[in-house]
Amino acid sequence: MKRLYLVRHAQSEYNEKGIFQGRLDSDLTPLGFVQARLLAREFLKKKVDIIYSSPQRRAYKTALTISDMLGTQLVVDERLREMSFGEYEGKHFWSMLEAHKDVFLNWLSNPVKHPLPTQESMEEFEKRVRSFLEDVKSSHYQNMLIVAHGGTLHAIVCLLTGIGLENLWNIHMDNAGITEIHMEGEKSTLVYLNKLCHTRQLT
């Protein structure tokens, strides 16, 4: 059995400001660095054979903090980048929702049927995420930690559990949230979603 730990990056500067990020590359906030250290402490309790990270700073610095504390190999994989939102990147989410309400509500309800006009195509997005998952399935590692972004990690959950990318935004993961999936052959089981108990001291 393979055990996958999916971790959404710690809080970034654009998260704090409510800005749509996608491929933009904002750094962690001071709170984000604290969250990353709390994640690292949490994973000291678990067996982790390898860490995979998106190359984007908010994910990479989260992963690097964990890797440094665990002494575990960190591998950067381009396929874990966040999906591109085109011309919507760098804009405030709520102002866009107000200006383009129907477009955004349709996209949130079913991004396959109603993609954003300028985003990375769902076909391209699915192809790169599936490519990564095929490598995960064939890997000799049994306990893998994957640090990436909301859209990318939601896609991994959708594809492994078979619920389809039309449910991409029906999943919620907070900054520094942990999700665990077990893989046995072609069967995947969602053990828990968006675990946050390691960050309780921040509330």
From Swiss-Prot:
InterPro entries: His_Pase_superF_clade-1, His_PPase_superfam, PGM_Phosphatase
Reaction catalyzed: O-phospho-L-serine + H2O = L-serine + phosphate; O-phospho-D-serine + H2O = D-serine + phosphate
Site (Important for activity): R58
Top-level EC class: hydrolase
Disulfide bonds: none
A biological process from GO: L-serine biosynthetic process
Pathway connected to this protein: Amino-acid biosynthesis; L-serine biosynthesis; L-serine from 3-phospho-D-glycerate: step 3/3
Pfam families: His_Phos_1
GO cellular component: cytoplasm
Activity regulation statement: Activity is not inhibited by EDTA in vitro, nor enhanced by the addition of Mg(2+).
CDD domains, A to Z: HP_PGM_like (cd07067)
Enzyme nomenclature, EC number: 3.1.3.3
UniProt entry keywords in alphabetical sequence: Amino-acid biosynthesis, Hydrolase, Serine biosynthesis
List of catalytic residues: H9, H149
MF GO annotations: L-phosphoserine phosphatase activity
Its job: Part of a complex that catalyzes the dephosphorylation of L-phosphoserine to serine and inorganic phosphate. Is poorly or not active toward D-phosphoserine, DL-phosphothreonine, 3-phosphoglycerate, para-nitrophenylphosphate, and fructose-6-phosphate. Does not display phosphoglycerate mutase activity.
Subunit structure: Heterodimer with PspA. The PspB subunit appears to have no or considerably lower PSP activity compared with that of PspA.
Family: Belongs to the histidine phosphatase superfamily. Metal-independent phosphoserine phosphatase family.
Name the record gives this protein: Putative phosphoserine phosphatase 2
Organism per entry: Hydrogenobacter thermophilus (strain DSM 6534 / IAM 12695 / TK-6)
Gene: pspB
